[in-house]
């Protein structure tokens, strides 16, 4: 079984009302890329779309990423399984690419 990746963004993000989040929009925001775990899979999403995210600093751990997103420090992508029962105030959306 393959776990889908989901965009995670602050609840007050201007695009949080979209049904699905465009991968291209992730490159217009500070992107919180995990240093371990799902880094290769997430990097592959950008490579497939020929995009380069703006990663302002290394981020360790899903909880740190979720807390930073909740605080408005950036957006991220995490596996759907991680996001099933998050205690953080953040919006999650499926991803799509206009370039695919």
PLM feature spans:
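Secondary-structure junction motif
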Residues: 15-16, 29-49
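Conserved functional loop/turn residues at catalytic and ligand-binding sites
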Residues: 25, 30, 50, 72-73, ...
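Short beta-strand-to-loop elements that line the ligand-binding cleft
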Residues: 33-35, 52-64
């Amino acid at each position: 079984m393959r776990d889908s990746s989901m965009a995670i963004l602050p609840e007050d993000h201007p695009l949080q009302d979209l049904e699905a989040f465009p991968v291209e929009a992730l490159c217009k925001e500070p992107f919180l890329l995990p240093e371990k775990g799902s880094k290769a899979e997430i990097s592959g999403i950008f490579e497939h779309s020929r995009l380069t995210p703006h990663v302002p600093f290394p981020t360790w751990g899903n909880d740190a990423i979720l807390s930073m997103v909740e605080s408005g420090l950036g957006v991220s992508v995490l596996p759907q399984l991680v996001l099933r029962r998050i205690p953080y105030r953040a919006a999650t959306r499926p991803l799509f690419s206009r370039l695919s």
